[in-house]
Amino acid sequence: MKIGVLALQGAVREHIHHIELSGHEGVAIKRIEQLEEIDGLILPGGESTTLRRLMNLYGFKEALQQSTLPMFGTCAGLIVMAKQISGEDGYLDKLDITVQRNSFGRQVDSFESELDVKGIAEDIEGVFIRAPHIEATHGDVDVLSTVGDKIVAVQEGRYLGVSFHPELTDDYRVTQYFIEAIVKPTLTEKV
């Protein structure tokens, strides 16, 4: 399978490395035309306001709103996938959740935590950098993991979102889950 990583900002190379470790082809997505060539898309972290501006500038907002590609958002990628961002409207409206930006604090408050992520593993290393958390889920959203009482990982159908940065660790199981459990089944739907 060919998995794209939106290459406007964030740890693009690290995400591609995790895709390759999962046994698949990773490609940096810089133009909307490339979306036709991939089976799934990862929206990496970074700064969510900057990410939205760049997505507007290069035409990705409309293309991704209309797309049915499976998507996996990490940190800022989770924020842009949300239907609601606390205090403002959502952006891509893919995950029926309300997200609170920077809810774990500033850069100096960044931390790592071992996570029990439902359906993946009980020992996933989560790297949280100015991370958001999910305040509320709606509809058919499945909560996959929490830190204390804060939701940090969810899935809704073909969309996966996490507050942390799995790509900044050596553990590629979250990316592998996205590809094998979310992207792969959608390919059989196309046949």
Curated annotation (Swiss-Prot):
It comes from Staphylococcus saprophyticus subsp. saprophyticus (strain ATCC 15305 / DSM 20229 / NCIMB 8711 / NCTC 7292 / S-41). CDD domains: GATase1_PB. One of its GO terms (cellular component) is cytosol. Catalyzes the hydrolysis of glutamine to glutamate and ammonia as part of the biosynthesis of pyridoxal 5'-phosphate. The resulting ammonia molecule is channeled to the active site of PdxS. The gene is pdxT. L-glutamine binds at residues 46-48, 101, 129-130. PROSITE patterns: PDXT_SNO_1, PDXT_SNO_2. This is Pyridoxal 5'-phosphate synthase subunit PdxT. The lineage of its organism: Bacteria, Bacillati, Bacillota, Bacilli, Bacillales. The keyword Transmembrane helix does not apply.
